[in-house]
A protein has these predicted regions:
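Cytosolic catalytic headpieces and adjacent flexible linkers of membrane translocases
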Residues: 1-170, 174, 188, 200-202, ...
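Basic, alpha-helical nucleic-acid-binding regions used in initiation and control of genome expression
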Residues: 191
Length: 329
């Protein structure tokens, strides 16, 4: 009919049910009462337990008009049915999670999906979900309460984008370094809030723009490989900083001691620069140096006080050789 438009809506089951007042059952439109809601939930819960995601479809006939339809039009809909589809985890998910755990990384699941679907997926990939927390249960919690809950909970389900962002922010506040991986529009706020936002090349544009790293490989094992390489690079970088700082401190200490006892300066500024240049050449091999296994398996943090202790201890030791040389001069 040219004077009538059919509005078709699809989305998460709970969201669609909230705007439906009728349901098409056995070819007839009947009221969506409590009894019918229980029947719908019973069927969809069975599908969710099998790991199937459910998308509800609803319709409504409206008088034809010009222009776009608004959110207010999405009311008094007729529930036509639902579509169940399987979105299995990647084959590399289970070994990647196992490898990350072995590297001291705690994995948490923050999803907008049903808690039944999420729990099924966690079971398939070997992740112990424990007690599931859903989004509606965290809205009334204070930041301190949610921070405590977030640290001991593995699986959060039925989350909104703001829920995800809040959890990530609170985990950071508690001193954790947080990496968040997502590929959808709903993941963008959490990707921005995380220390490291990770997405994939097939993600929506807004997720790729919000991410710090985009994975081009299909295998999730690249995450563990990236962690190992990052820790190796960080360890070797610390070696360079410690060696350079202690060397420079030792040189300055040597000059100060010499100026107190010798009538001349044993090392001019040019000598120090040449010495540092030669020293830097010897440090070219540091990026390729081996790193102890315990340093790779355990996350490390930047600790300035440790650098200070190293510099104060090894700097004067190197100065001993300088001072002995000055005495011979």
């Amino acid at each position: 009919e040219t004077d009538v438009h059919q509005l078709v809506c699809k989305g998460a089951l709970q969201e669609i049910l909230s705007v439906c007042t009728q349901v098409r059952y056995s070819g007839e439109v009947v009221p969506l009462d409590d009894n019918m809601l229980r029947r719908v939930k019973r069927v969809t819960d069975t599908l969710n337990r099998q790991g199937l995601r459910v998308v509800a479809v609803a319709t409504k006939y409206l008088p034809a008009r010009e222009g776009d339809y608004q959110r207010i039009d999405e009311s008094d809909l007729i529930l036509e049915g639902y579509i169940a589809f399987l979105d299995p985890p990647k084959e590399t998910t289970a070994p990647a999670l196992k490898a990350l755990k072995a590297s001291g990384i705690t994995v948490k699941i923050l999803t907008g999906d049903s808690e039944l679907v999420a729990a099924k997926v966690c079971h398939e990939v070997g992740l112990d979900a424990g007690d599931v927390v859903i989004g509606s249960n965290i809205e009334g919690l204070s930041d301190d309460e949610l921070a405590t809950l977030a640290q001991r909970t593995t699986l959060f389900a039925r989350l909104t984008p703001m829920h995800k962002e809040r959890i990530v922010t609170l985990l950071k506040r508690e001193g954790h370094v947080v990496g968040f991986m997502g590929d959808g529009i709903n993941d963008a706020p959490a990707l921005r809030a995380a220390d490291i936002g990770i997405s994939v090349d097939g993600a929506v544009d807004i997720a790729r723009e919000a991410a710090d790293i985009i994975l081009l490989e299909k295998s999730l094992m690249v995450l563990e490989e990236g962690v190992i390489e990052g820790r190796r690079t960080f360890s070797n970088m610390l070696k360079y900083i410690k060696m350079t700082a202690s060397s420079n401190f030792g040189n300055v200490f040597s000059v100060l001691v010499a100026s107190a006892f010798l009538p001349f300066l044993p090392m001019l500024p040019l000598h120090l620069l040449i010495q540092n240049l030669l020293y830097d050449v010897s440090q070219v091999a540091i990026p390729f140096d081996n790193v102890d296994e315990e340093q790779i398996k355990k996350p490390q943090r930047w600790n300035p006080s440790e650098l200070g202790r190293f510099m104060i201890f090894f700097g004067p030791i190197s100065s001993i050789f300088d001072i002995l040389t000055f005495c011979l001069m």
